[in-house]
């Protein structure tokens, strides 16, 4: 390990600013996330490392909590930078880029829903589990989630019948009267605010797809540490990719970009936003306050302050309602599994070739089939509200399945650990099928 590497240990903890009295939204200061490590600037090291230096192993440790000390968490990050300085090609599952424009979309049949009778839909899957849609995790362990039965009860909706999921006009959070128009606008907006599909090869020379995965894995832990909402995480990743599309960056500033984008997304999405000093602290004070503010200005100006971006999480919420159909009790396991699969897609640079709405629809498809392999995972309701037929999702679904089944590196385990908790129904421990029958996509 390099002598200049920072090591956050229990014996010599970095002093934490006294934020407990003013920032009640943050966790206990003892439960601290170690900095990203060797792909960042080092506080006491050189800001301009020699070109021949390569990434070395780094150990990150979690500090002591007030209740009991936690075991050290070490992570070996050997990213294998090539001697030529060029990033290796990102373990692409296919060299074929699927442009959004080539995907055939179904036309919404609004007249069909307008003429159909109002259907009762009392339970909303987006409201049933606060741990998914808000940053306040469930702390009442007395609540016992009801696990859906995987047996076929014979009361499934007719596959050819479209269920009106916008019939509940009494719930203002659903915006039932405007939902169709809102999501039509989001479908147009997602095309205009997508990052380049090959920016790593065209623009970047100091970073590669593996470094991007480690950064996003670290951002997942930062979001958990400060209890930020999932929407904040998805927005931060979008800002990172869009900025990297047109700006070459060295590996020493990659963490600075990531934590700055998380700060921007938190300002946009959160009610209780961590201070700039909190984001400096989470990097082990590797970066100064002024550096974060300068990077914030650079990101905002490059994005032209266009921060409203539809992410896969936006579409996933509506698609899960469509998957629920007429069920009065939402399937929490299905929701958590779909969220897990969608979040896994953030780690894979190759998944950028798929539109966010396609990723969300594919996650619902795979979650439905994983939990109910004897049923058809796609029906007329899902086809109508997602505008995707099963055949359009084949490549994306198979890539998600590969992500779910492959043994991830020890450097990117945050998402799997997150969804192995009880509040997420242990979704990460659910075994996905090894393969998918071809008739599912006919």
Curated annotation (Swiss-Prot):
Pfam families listed in its UniProt record: Cyclin_C, Cyclin_N
Cytoplasm is among the record's keywords: yes
Q: Which family does it belong to?
A: Belongs to the cyclin family. Cyclin AB subfamily.
What InterPro entries does UniProt report for this protein, alphabetically? Cyclin, Cyclin-like_dom, Cyclin-like_sf, Cyclin_A/B-like, Cyclin_C-dom, Cyclin_N, Cyclins_cyclin-box
Function statement: Involved in the regulation of male meiosis progression.
What tissue specificity does the UniProt entry give?
Expressed in roots, stems and flowers.
**Keyword terms:** Cell cycle, Cell division, Cyclin, Cytoplasm, Meiosis, Nucleus
**UniProt subunit comment:** Interacts with CDC20-1, CDC20-2, FZR2/CCS52A1 and FZR1/CCS52A2.
Stretch list, region Disordered: 1-72
Question: What is the annotated localization of this protein?
Answer: Cytoplasm; Nucleus
Give the source's domain of life in one word: Eukaryota
Against Gene3D superfamilies, the record matches this protein to:
Cyclin-like (1.10.472.10)
Q: Can you say what this protein is called?
A: Cyclin-A1-2
Biased composition, Polar residues: where in the chain?
1-12, 39-63
Kindly report the protein's main subcellular placement as a broad class: cytoplasm
Cellular-component GO terms for this entry: cytoplasm; nucleus
Q: Name one GO biological process term.
A: cell division
Which species does the entry assign this protein to? Arabidopsis thaliana (Mouse-ear cress)
An example molecular function term from Gene Ontology annotations: cyclin-dependent protein serine/threonine kinase regulator activity
- State the SMART domains in the record: CYCLIN (SM00385), Cyclin_C (SM01332)
